[in-house]
Amino acid sequence: MSIKRVISGLIGFPIVALVLIFGNQIVIDIAFAIIAAMSFHEYSHAFKVSDKAKPLTWLGYLACVTIALIHVFPREYLMLIIGAVVPIAILLCFAQILITKMKTTIIDAAVTLFGICYIVIFLMFMPIIRAAENGVFLIWYVM
């Protein structure tokens, strides 16, 4: 384990804890969007270094931006937005494959979609839980 990762964890966790305790909803949404972008960057970098796949990073970062926007829309549309993230991502992945004339492979699209589902959608529920009734307490069960 790298000392760089330990130090970033020791610095990062108190910052996230302070944002969750004292931040308003917009600050929390933006903070989790930044965390998702950093996580997706690490995820895609791991695949690029190993030459197994080249995830579509622009699509992953675009999905991360949706976390910052989830409380901009009315609450009754929230589940529709979350449910639309994956089908739109699939559509954009296949459009990328067609536009690049198969230079982007199905494996690249699959790795990208898995990263969006695993990282972005999971982290999207954190601000939603925090905004719920008694969410200030419930968020610590998830963390």
Model segments located where?
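Membrane-embedded alpha-helical bundles of polytopic integral membrane proteins
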Residues: 2-143
